[in-house]
Amino acid sequence: MTNPAQPTGPKIIVPEGMEPAYANLARISHSPADIVIDFAHILPGESSANIRSRVVMTPLSAKLLLHALTENLARYEAAFGEISMPSNSS
């Protein structure tokens, strides 16, 4: 007898025509209730960047995102090699 597949979470629907937002800079801030991540794109040699997207989430959601990113980056590095961090990154 086979077991029915367990649900893996909500069905994710991507709206038709949705454009991706490229970001090479993120700014993170928080309040007691929320974590705010601003994603921006900055060009080489520029001193300012325009925020392309702002994501506000609960601290729990941020921790779950951190866990998912950690797992996915580990898989990425296992497949493609270690990602080198620049010496001036924070």
Can you annotate each of these PLM segments?
Residues 1-90:
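Positively charged, low-complexity terminal tracts
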